[in-house]
Amino acid sequence: MQAVFSSPSPAPVTPLMPLPDITQERFLRVPEVMHLCGLSRSTIYELIRKGEFPPQVSLGGKNVAWLHSEVTAWMAGRIAGRKRGYDA
C-alpha cells in the first residue's frame, strides 16, 4: 500500500485594505444626471463650484461623467435633510 501525499495549498491572500466593489458602479453622463436629479446643467455645475454636489470624473479629453453611487448618495442626503426639517 502506498501513501499519497499532497503538497499543502497556499494560504489565501487577503488585501491589506478592502477593495471597493466597483462591479455595480457605473458612470452617468450629464444628461442622465440632469434626468435623475431634476436639475439643469448650469445648476449642477454651480452646486459643484460651491462644493454641494459630487464633482465629475474626467474620462479623457472633454468627456466627463459622475459616479452613480455618488449622485444617489447626494440625493439620499437631500431626502434626509428634508426629513430633518431643513434644506440639506
UniProtKB/Swiss-Prot annotation:
GO molecular function: DNA binding
SUPFAM superfamilies: Putative DNA-binding domain
InterPro entries attached to this UniProt entry: AlpA (IPR010260), DNA-bd_dom_put_sf (IPR009061), Prophage_regulatory_activator (IPR052931)
Pfam families listed in its UniProt record: Phage_AlpA
Origin superkingdom: Viruses
Keywords (A to Z) from UniProt: DNA-binding
PANTHER family listed in its UniProt record: DNA-BINDING TRANSCRIPTIONAL ACTIVATOR ALPA
Name assigned to this protein: Uncharacterized protein ORF88
Species of provenance: Enterobacteria phage P4
